[in-house]
């Protein structure tokens, strides 16, 4: 907050000179003054009620406390499910910022991470009445906060996950594997995650009509299992095509 307050003060000084003749600078100055008052009260900019236009006006100020955050409360084993008075205080504070709080016991999480056998992990978590490691919730919340999602490519040798931004279309999603996949994108074979889990294999999904052919406008969904077809011109002026199976 102190860093942002310093940045806002400097920006206000510049805008005051420009605001006399520049309407945009005048708008920015008004928003910056709101931000200064808010920061002086010990509050973060992300908790300030600003319109989309207001936030656009101060976008180039790159204020740290405007960025969304997530809090992680490390508690003891006895408090891992219910939290304690300290994590409750954190939750209350986070409400004002619209932020999420993940309550977890790092000691337990470390022990889970050391167990390589899935059966051993299941037994260990059952002893602590855990359905899944808290680390899973942490990762999922971080992805949500950063507006990210995952799709998969599944082949005989391995299954791989790829991270993309929400709202990306199939060609953009393909580009994280290789830029040629976006340039020469033809189509994508898509299986929904739930269908892949239910039918266990690509062949079974195909037999049950759960494999779809999607084009360039397809919006990739979180968990999609995808194969890409593309066609590009190489340096020898010849075409090569590929159906990706990783």
What is the meaning of each model-derived region?
Residues 5-9:
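Conserved phosphoryl-transfer catalytic core
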Residues 238-246:
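Hydrophobic alpha-helical signal peptides and transmembrane signal-/tail-anchor segments
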Residues 14-219, 226, 231-233:
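C-terminal-of-GTPase-core extension/linker across diverse P-loop GTPases
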Residues 1:
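Conserved P-loop NTPase nucleotide-binding/switch module
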Residues 223, 236-239:
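Intrinsic-disorder/low-complexity regions
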């Amino acid at each position: 907050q102190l860093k942002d307050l310093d940045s806002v003060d400097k920006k206000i000084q510049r805008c005051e000179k420009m605001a006399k003749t520049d309407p945009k600078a005048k708008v920015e100055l008004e928003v910056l003054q709101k931000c200064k008052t808010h920061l002086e009260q010990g509050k973060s900019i992300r908790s300030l009620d600003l319109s989309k236009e207001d936030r656009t006006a101060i976008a180039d100020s790159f204020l740290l406390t405007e960025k969304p955050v997530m809090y992680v409360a490390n508690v003891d084993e006895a408090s891992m499910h219910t939290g304690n008075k300290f994590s409750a205080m954190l939750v209350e504070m986070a409400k004002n910022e619209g932020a999420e709080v993940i309550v977890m016991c790092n000691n337990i999480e470390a022990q889970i991470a050391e167990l390589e056998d899935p059966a051993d992990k299941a037994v260990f978590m059952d002893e602590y009445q855990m359905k899944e490691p808290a680390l899973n919730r942490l990762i999922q919340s971080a992805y949500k906060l950063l507006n990210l999602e995952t799709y998969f490519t599944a082949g005989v040798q391995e299954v791989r996950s790829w991270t993309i931004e929400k709202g990306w279309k199939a060609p953009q999603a393909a580009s994280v594997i290789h830029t040629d996949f976006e340039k020469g994108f033809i189509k994508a074979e898509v299986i929904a995650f739930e269908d892949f889990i239910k039918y266990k294999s690509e062949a079974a999904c195909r037999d049950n009509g759960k494999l779809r052919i999607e084009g360039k406008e397809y919006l990739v969904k979180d968990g999609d299992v995808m194969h890409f077809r593309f066609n590009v011109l190489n340096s020898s002026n010849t075409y090569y095509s590929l159906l990706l199976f990783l």
